[in-house]
């Protein structure tokens, strides 16, 4: 079984979000599972530099200009690169300029990505062609459409990592992207009078996956579907929509081997976690005290992530004696709010604006509770890292958060399945109730330790996801 992942980023070469973590780990897990998985990426500068052994496979003149297809390896995974400097050789973000304006030629930059993905199934590399083209998010959404236009030389899977990003472009660009105008149709890639790369993926793929079972259900409902609910309900009825939970890359996220921690530990040596907490308290300017629970946030600061609720609930958390360490960037109003809280409560609130991968490991190793109060969360990796590190996740019941964290209710504690704290409603009162439950559990150290060990024993390895995808691919054949 030969599978080509078509996507726009891959950890650690280039990362703007969780999509990169998935592509950085899933193909390697699939190879270990017996699937010949390769990845197709645009040759953005950081990616091009990282694939040092890239060789020319093919050269083509396309609707988006001249391209060179390269092939190399990274961490044992075969990588195809679309080398088109006029489209991809730009500093900074792959999606927008330094003023945060989307590049005006994004329609061509990402149509080309989909087109090359489909051409791979028609022999663009004469020595390897995929049985399945697996496209990820809107950037690769046209790959299933180009395959459909080509007579479907391969099966296609489209994975929704976040339905909120739709890749919308003016209709006149149909003239530029070499797809039949007949595709510009409500039964096709047209959405609200525009081209939707996301809808192209949803409509033309043989199968759609979402990154958790709950999110796969949620996106058939109007409040989560951004206008796509009709199509997604239809795909659900046809048995062509399912959820496959993301995994954790255990080579990178494991407290036993994590070199970024001051003190490594396992579920049997959890007392060694205390040194990480001490170091984190020092680094964040917090009072060094192992008796108080340290809550943490590692997140983009947006309302989707529910961080406004944390600000609102913060006085209640601090009154009970807790501490907060926050690492993140985003909405300027939220940034200011958290910085003001750090100034108002020195020693209790520590804030670092920005994102540092290394420091996120130190927070995960040192905190007692990781807060993930998202309004919606397709899968979420942060809570999975928390479980792995014995840093109990406090989450809202939505998307992948609902699939991965079990509340410390009395019955869950009795059944030995409790792994964190879960609240229902997207408001500060509901969040504070969950924070209160965390304090109650914290006051019973042996029970807290029991739940930590429970959480750390859970299996969210990529091997589980790789097996699910393999079974899906074989069903499509």
From Swiss-Prot:
A GO term from the CC aspect: cytosol
GO MF assignments: alpha-1,4-glucan glucosyltransferase (ADP-glucose donor) activity; alpha-1,4-glucan glucosyltransferase (UDP-glucose donor) activity
Record-listed ADP-alpha-D-glucose binding positions: 15
Catalytic activity: [(1->4)-alpha-D-glucosyl](n) + ADP-alpha-D-glucose = [(1->4)-alpha-D-glucosyl](n+1) + ADP + H(+)
InterPro entries cross-referenced by the UniProt entry: Glyco_trans_1, GS/SS, Starch_synth_cat_dom
Superkingdom of source: Bacteria
Broad enzyme group: transferase
Keyword annotations: Glycogen biosynthesis, Glycosyltransferase, Transferase
Keyword Glycosyltransferase: yes
Entry keyword annotation includes Transcription regulation: no
EC number assigned by the record: 2.4.1.21
Any one GO biological process: glycogen biosynthetic process
Pathway of action: Glycan biosynthesis; glycogen biosynthesis
Alphabetical list of CDD domains matching this protein: GT5_Glycogen_synthase_DULL1-like
Role of this protein: Synthesizes alpha-1,4-glucan chains using ADP-glucose.
Family to which this protein belongs: Belongs to the glycosyltransferase 1 family. Bacterial/plant glycogen synthase subfamily.
NCBIfam families documented for this protein: glgA, PRK00654.1-2
Protein name as annotated: Glycogen synthase
């Amino acid at each position: 079984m030969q599978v080509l992942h078509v996507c726009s980023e891959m950890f650690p070469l280039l990362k703007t979000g969780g999509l990169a973590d998935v592509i950085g780990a899933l193909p390697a897990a699939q190879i270990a599972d017996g699937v010949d998985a390769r990845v197709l990426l645009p040759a953005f500068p950081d990616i091009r530099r990282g694939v040092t052994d890239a060789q020319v496979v093919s050269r083509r003149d396309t609707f988006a200009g001249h391209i060179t297809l390269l092939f190399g390896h990274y961490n044992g995974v075969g990588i195809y690169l679309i080398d088109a400097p006029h489209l991809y050789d730009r500093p900074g973000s792959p999606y927008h300029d330094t003023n945060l304006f989307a590049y005006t030629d994004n329609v061509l930059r990402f149509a080309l990505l989909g087109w090359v993905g489909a051409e791979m199934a028609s022999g663009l590399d004469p020595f390897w062609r995929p049985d399945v083209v697996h496209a990820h998010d809107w950037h690769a959404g046209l790959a299933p459409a180009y395959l459909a236009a080509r007579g479907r030389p391969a099966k296609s899977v489209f994975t929704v990592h976040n339905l909120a990003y739709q890749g919308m472009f003016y209709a006149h660009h149909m003239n530029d992207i070499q797809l039949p105008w007949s595709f510009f149709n409500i039964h096709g890639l047209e959405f609200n009078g525009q081209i939707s790369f996301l809808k192209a993926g949803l409509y033309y793929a043989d199968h759609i996956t979402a990154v958790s079972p709950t999110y796969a259900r949620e996106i058939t409902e109007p409040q989560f579907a951004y206008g796509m609910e009709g199509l997604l309900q239809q795909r659900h009825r046809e048995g062509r929509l399912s959820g496959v939970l993301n995994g954790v890359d255990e080579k990178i996220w494991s407290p036993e081997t994590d070199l970024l921690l001051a003190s490594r530990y396992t579920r049997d040596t959890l007392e060694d976690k205390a040194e990480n907490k001490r170091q984190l308290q020092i680094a964040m300017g917090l009072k060094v005290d192992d008796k108080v629970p340290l809550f943490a946030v590692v997140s983009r600061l947006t309302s989707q992530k529910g961080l406004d609720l944390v600000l609102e609930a913060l006085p209640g958390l601090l009154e009970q004696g807790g501490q907060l360490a926050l690492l993140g960037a985003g909405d300027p109003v939220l940034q200011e709010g958290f910085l003001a809280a750090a100034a108002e409560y020195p020693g209790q609130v520590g804030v670092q604006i920005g994102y540092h991968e290394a420091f996120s490991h130190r927070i995960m190793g040192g905190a007692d509770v990781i807060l993930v109060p998202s309004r919606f969360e397709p899968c979420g990796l942060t809570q999975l890292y928390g479980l792995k590190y014995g840093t109990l996740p406090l989450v809202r019941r939505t998307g992948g958060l609902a699939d991965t964290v079990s509340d410390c209710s009395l019955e869950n504690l009795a059944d030995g399945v409790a792994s964190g704290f879960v609240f229902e409603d997207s408001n500060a009162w509901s969040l504070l109730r969950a924070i209160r439950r965390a304090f109650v559990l914290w006051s019973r150290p042996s029970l807290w330790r029991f739940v930590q060990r429970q959480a750390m024993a859970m299996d969210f390895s990529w091997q589980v996801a790789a097996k699910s995808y393999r079974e899906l691919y074989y069903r499509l054949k």
